[in-house]
Design a protein with these regions (language model features):
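Short low-complexity, flexible loop/linker segments enriched in glycine and/or proline
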Residues: 331-335, 357, 379-381, 565-567
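Short, flexible loop segments at the rims of nucleotide/cofactor-binding pockets, characterized by
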Residues: 338-343
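Cysteine-centered catalytic environments shared across enzyme families
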Residues: 1-337, 349, 353, 544, ...
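Adenosyl-5′-phosphate
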Residues: 1-7, 21-22, 117, 170-171, ...
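Active-site adenylate/phosphate-handling loop in enzymes that bind or generate adenylated species
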Residues: 351-411, 487, 496-516
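Short catalytic/ligand-binding loop motif for oxyanion handling, primarily in non-cytosolic enzymes
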Residues: 137-139, 148-149, 169, 371-375, ...
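Non-catalytic, well-ordered alpha-helical scaffold segments
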Residues: 85, 105-108, 181, 196, ...
Length: 628
């Protein structure tokens, strides 16, 4: 696991080595073990590529950049390739010679043999850049799910790319203007999905794509990574259950290859419990499992992780944390995202990563289980949308919404359940794009139009995704496809990457496996959600290893009481961000409208937890990063 950087600039326009080292320094936390640089002159440009390394595989010989045998090609790489041994053996049989045991060298050798068509053969999480001197081009690629980040920007004098925004921006003469589409997306979704960033002219490379940069003319094109889809044959649910079992076991096995200590995050939920079980079954010695508990019983679920640990006989590490532990790290965590990000579960993810780092360098997680196997309530609720809209006329529906809205508005909602009920009812749509509404956890378009100034609001901010993924969402497969592009890539994986990398620990997600994704896409919806039983086929595959009904117990997740914090220890900071003079100078918000929304929450007139937290996170970024 590492961080990578690179740029193409006009010759003699910058001190390339100093700039590259600055970029590496800004992402030192991603790879504190070593660093490397490559600089060359090509045509009218200077080309630079750098990286910082967190050593996991081939610790002694895996430093980068890595060169081809004839020095004509060079690579810097962030991530892990889980099938690299299989690919390496195939290449050796074709006559390739390897100098290291690293997966980085395998990527480069495979590229030498097959070009960018080889990228689809990689099973793993990655962002890398390959410079090919024979054709004067750089290829910059990102993995299938988007586990590893990659930002890029074309400027008047060249092209820049980096693992984190802070590194890329250090190469620009000034910070770009705020992108209004990204601004609206953030306040709707509470995160900014690829390809957008908060800055004009800077983009995220979307998952499963690569950039082809022509260094002769400073021109680039973006292509989807071609890959063959795995086909599966099954005649019954029992067959599908066996395939599920084997695919999950194999994925855990491939993701447990490491030359450094490894363990699992064990929350006690279905996904992390199954990953931990598989790893325990595959290892000869006790595995290390890690969980956090809360000193407040309302938020604590550590009994579930203890139960699983006892079942699989793991060496369990449990860290009890308080609200003070969470709030003490807010600045460090939120500002590390480099752009507005309002998923409050990042606070707990950071803490479990930080505490786990004292014991292991790699942790397997249950991330992706809900998206791959159909684990969200919103999936079967989505199926009810068509039934509901066919039975309930719009006029009656909106009367129901108004009544429930008034009923729930003044209630406290620390876990967001009442908010979700209100959001669910308001998102029911008679025009078939229900699911895009239900995943919008922030403001509605009407609310955004009210609180944002005219020049800051962008209507139809989700249109890019509706055009790319599809407008109509009527099946679980549709919902999962939307989540893969938006919530998984833009929220979940960003959260895990930034919080774990901030503590210099590598997280691996066995459920984020292309074969598993292909397989579950070929299953009937009823195999994923059977009545009210979510992740049905996954539970069927592993139920024999757990006590009866254990896998059907609900889990609350990393909920934190941000609504209370905004009325207490965060209130002074929040009110500073609401200062009239500051808001007028900022020229983004309507002062009267945003003040009313915030003050209604602070005075407990209306529970606006999610909206006010989103506003708070944006203002924290604006004041401490954008204005800094």
């Amino acid at each position: 696991m590492c961080g990578i950087n690179g740029f193409l600039v006009k010759k003699n326009s910058v001190d390339s080595i100093s700039q590259l080292r600055l970029m590496n320094k800004l992402i030192f936390h991603r790879g504190p073990d070593s660093h490397g640089e490559f600089i060359d002159e090509i045509y009218d440009y200077s080309l630079a590529m750098g990286m910082t390394r967190l050593s996991i595989i081939d610790i002694d010989n895996g430093n980068q950049p890595i060169y081809s045998e004839d020095k004509s090609k060079v690579i810097v790489f962030n991530g892990e390739i889980y099938n690299y041994q299989i690919l390496k053996n195939q290449l050796i049989s074709d006559g390739c010679i390897f100098k290291t045991n690293s997966d980085t060298e395998v990527i480069l050798s495979l590229y030498e043999k097959e070009g960018p068509n080889s990228f689809g053969k990689l099973d793993g999480m990655f962002a890398f850049s390959i410079y090919d001197t024979t054709i004067g081009k750089v290829f910059i690629a990102r993995d299938f799910f988007g586990e590893k980040p990659l930002y890029y920007s074309q400027t008047a004098t060249g092209f820049i790319w980096a693992s984190e925004l802070k590194s890329l921006i250090s190469s620009l003469p000034s910070k770009p203007e705020i992108d209004t589409i990204a601004l609206s997306l953030f306040f709707k979704l509470t995160f900014i999905p690829a390809p957008f960033t908060i800055y004009q002219g800077i983009k995220k490379l979307e998952a499963n794509h690569y950039i082809e940069l022509d260094c002769k003319i400073n021109n680039f094109s973006i292509f989807e990574i071609y890959r063959s889809t795995s086909k599966f044959s099954f005649n019954s649910k029992n067959d599908a259950s066996k395939i599920t079992h084997d695919l999950v076991q194999n994925s855990v096995l491939s993701r447990s290859i490491s030359d450094v200590p490894l363990g699992t995050f064990l929350s006690g939920g279905v996904d992390s419990s199954i990953v931990s079980l598989c790893l325990a079954q595959q290892q000869d010695t006790k595995i290390d499992t890690f969980s956090i508990g809360f000193d407040k019983k309302a938020f604590d679920e550590s009994d579930k992780s203890r139960q699983v640990s006892k079942l699989i006989n793991s060496k369990h590490h449990e860290f009890i944390i308080s609200e003070k532990d969470l709030t003490a790290n807010i600045d460090e965590i939120l500002l590390n995202f480099d752009e507005p990000f309002a998923d409050s579960s990042a606070l707990a993810t950071y803490l479990v990563s930080k505490k786990t780092k004292d014991f292991v360098k790699v942790a397997l997680t249950g991330d992706g289980g809900d998206e791959v196997f159909g684990g969200y309530n919103k999936y079967y609720i989505g199926n009810l949308n068509k039934k509901y809209t066919s039975l309930v006329p719009p006029k009656i529906h909106f009367n129901i919404v108004g009544y429930i809205d008034n009923l729930l508005s003044i209630k406290d909602d620390s876990r967001g359940n009442r908010f979700k009920i209100k959001r669910l009812l308001k998102s029911i749509n008679y025009e078939d794009d229900f699911y895009y509404n239900i995943i919008s956890l922030g403001f509605t378009d009407d609310e955004l139009k009210s609180i944002l100034n005219v020049g800051s609001f962008s209507s139809n901010s989700l249109q890019y995704f509706k055009d790319k993924i599809g407008l109509y969402s009527s099946s679980i497969s549709d919902f999962r496809a939307i989540d893969k592009h938006l919530s998984l890539e833009g929220d979940m994986l960003v959260k895990v990457d930034r919080t774990s990398m901030l503590t210099s620990i590598e997280c691996r997600a066995p459920f984020l496996n292309k074969e598993l994704w292909d397989f579950t896409n070929q299953l009937p919806d009823t195999y994923l959600i059977n009545g009210w039983d979510k992740k049905h086929i996954l539970k069927e595959a592993f139920k024999e290893y757990f006590p009866k009904n254990f896998l059907n117990k609900s889990k609350k997740g990393f909920g934190v009481p941000v609504g209370d914090w905004l009325r207490s220890e965060l209130q002074l900071e929040l009110l500073f961000y609401l200062d009239k003079e500051f808001l007028i100078k900022q020229n983004i918000f309507d002062f009267e409208k945003i003040s009313k929304l915030v003050l209604n929450h602070l005075e407990s007139k209306v529970d606006n937890t999610f909206r006010v937290w989103t506003f708070y996170c944006f203002q924290k970024w604006y004041k401490n990063t954008y204005e800094a």
